[in-house]
Amino acid sequence: MIVSTKGRYALRVMVHFAQRGGEEYIPLKEIAEAEGISQKYLESIMSTLSKAGFVDAVHGKGGGYRLNRKAEEYTVGSILKLTEGSLSAVSCTTQGASACSRSECCNALPMWTRLDKMIDEFFEGITIADLIQESNTL
């Protein structure tokens, strides 16, 4: 599993909001400049986060984006699943994927399934608040 740029940037943006307190609307341009992300690419990420209900969006003068929950309520897993679609290490264990012709005799399938569970539990066990707290101790 390789986390895409979209997933990494989405995490950075969510941390950015949380560090700012999450209350005020932050203009897209300001977020892009602060995080070193192209405004065009960030629009796509923010659209994804907004449509999924992770952030609130207000358009026009004085508008921008903000968190609509506490940082403790956003897991890294939920953000990455939204942006990546799947956190599966191999395609045959991806939810909704067509069954592999060898799935019934694949000796490695149980291992891949356990790995997927470990990855899911790991990322679901980390919140945006945890990321901020850990970075403050470095």
Walk through the language-model features, giving the residues of each:
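Short amphipathic alpha-helical interface segments
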Residues: 8-22
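A short alpha-helical element within helix-turn-helix/winged-helix DNA-binding domains
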Residues: 26-36
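Alpha-helical residues within the helix-turn-helix
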Residues: 33, 50-51
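Short, hydrophobic-biased segments on the C-terminal half of alpha helices
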Residues: 46-47
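Beta-hairpin "wing" of winged helix-turn-helix
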Residues: 54-62, 66-67
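Non-DNA-binding regulatory cores of transcription-related proteins
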Residues: 68-138
